[in-house]
């Protein structure tokens, strides 16, 4: 991995997001692709885990305030629609994040900088890094800038996504909650295939695949829902 001009990278991120990072090593971690990092180097995976939770929490609060008459189910479906991968990827592309992700030349040549899974992961990692670097004001400002208008225009309640529908189905019948497990990841890095297994106690398991872990979970949930609704 070649040396990175951290100050130049921080300036580009400031121009893209409006946030000035203080901890440049943290920013570097948020933008480092897992395939580029060495065993001793950090990459964006841990910050992605954190950023995913921060984004979900902030959008949840936003919707709670915007739609005081919506029940839990409506709010959940709206949140799911707002934080789904395609929305996150669209925002990542709008700020030119792909060109700022640190990856190998081969990865970039194969389209890695515009890979939906990479863009989604990197933007969530960047949000997680904002949280760690500057606290609530840092990430709230960015999330509100890019998600508030989208939320305000949700005058309807989106249809349930398969994971939410499956969860509500089993809860309504007193069944054990679905458990999701990543079984495998195959294919080239710029076009991966994830396989996720969903299981419900005493009702077996089903395997779903997709170009990201989240899409594979949704596919598995859809297939499981089809299976259990066809039970006698």
From Swiss-Prot:
User: Which top-level group of life is the source organism from?
Assistant: Bacteria
Among InterPro entries, the record links this protein to: dsRBD_dom (IPR014720), RNase_III (IPR011907), RNase_III_dom (IPR000999), RNase_III_sf (IPR036389)
Residues that bind Mg(2+), according to the entry? 48, 121, 124
**Record domain RNase III: where:** 10-135
Q: Which positions fall inside the DRBM domain? A: 161-230
Supply one GO molecular-function term.
Answer: rRNA binding
**Reactions catalysed:** Endonucleolytic cleavage to 5'-phosphomonoester
Identify the NCBIfam families for this entry: RNaseIII
State which gene encodes it: rnc
Q: EC number(s) for this protein?
A: 3.1.26.3
A GO cellular-component term linked to this record: cytoplasm
UniProt keyword Transport, yes or no = no
Q: Where in the cell is it found?
A: Cytoplasm
What does the UniProt function comment say about this protein? Digests double-stranded RNA. Involved in the processing of primary rRNA transcript to yield the immediate precursors to the large and small rRNAs (23S and 16S). Processes some mRNAs, and tRNAs when they are encoded in the rRNA operon. Processes pre-crRNA and tracrRNA of type II CRISPR loci if present in the organism.
Record's subunit section: Homodimer.
Q: Which family does it belong to?
A: Belongs to the ribonuclease III family.
Q: Name one GO biological process term.
A: tRNA processing
Q: Can you name this protein? A: Ribonuclease 3
Active site at: 52, 124
Q: What is its main location?
A: cytoplasm
Please list every transmembrane segment annotated in the UniProt record, as residue ranges: none
What are the record keywords, sorted?
Cytoplasm, Endonuclease, Hydrolase, Magnesium, Metal-binding, mRNA processing, Nuclease, RNA-binding, rRNA processing, rRNA-binding, tRNA processing
Cofactor(s) named in the record: Mg(2+)
């Amino acid at each position: 991995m070649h040396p990175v001009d951290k100050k130049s990278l921080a300036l580009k991120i400031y121009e893209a997001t409006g946030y000035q990072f203080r901890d440049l090593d943290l920013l570097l971690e948020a933008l480092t692709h897992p395939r580029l990092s060495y065993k001793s180097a950090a990459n964006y995976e841990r910050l992605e885990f954190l950023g995913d939770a921060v984004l979900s929490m902030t959008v949840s609060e936003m919707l709670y305030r915007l739609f005081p008459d919506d029940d839990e189910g409506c709010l959940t479906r709206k949140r799911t629609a707002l934080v789904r991968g395609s929305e996150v990827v669209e925002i990542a592309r709008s700020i030119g994040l792909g060109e700022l992700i640190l990856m190998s030349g081969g990865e970039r040549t194969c389209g890695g900088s515009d890979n939906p899974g990479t863009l989604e992961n990197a933007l969530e990692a960047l949000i997680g890094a904002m949280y760690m670097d500057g606290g609530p004001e840092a990430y709230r400002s960015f999330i509100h800038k890019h998600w508030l208008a989208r939320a305000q225009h949700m005058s309807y309640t989106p249809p349930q996504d398969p994971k939410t529908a499956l969860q509500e189905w089993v809860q309504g019948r007193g069944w054990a909650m679905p458990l999701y497990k990543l079984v495998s990841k195959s294919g080239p890095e710029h076009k991966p295939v994830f396989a996720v297994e969903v299981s419900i106690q005493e009702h077996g398991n089903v395997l779903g695949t997709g170009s990201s872990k989240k899409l594979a979970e949704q596919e598995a949930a859809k297939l499981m829902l089809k299976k259990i609704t066809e039970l006698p």
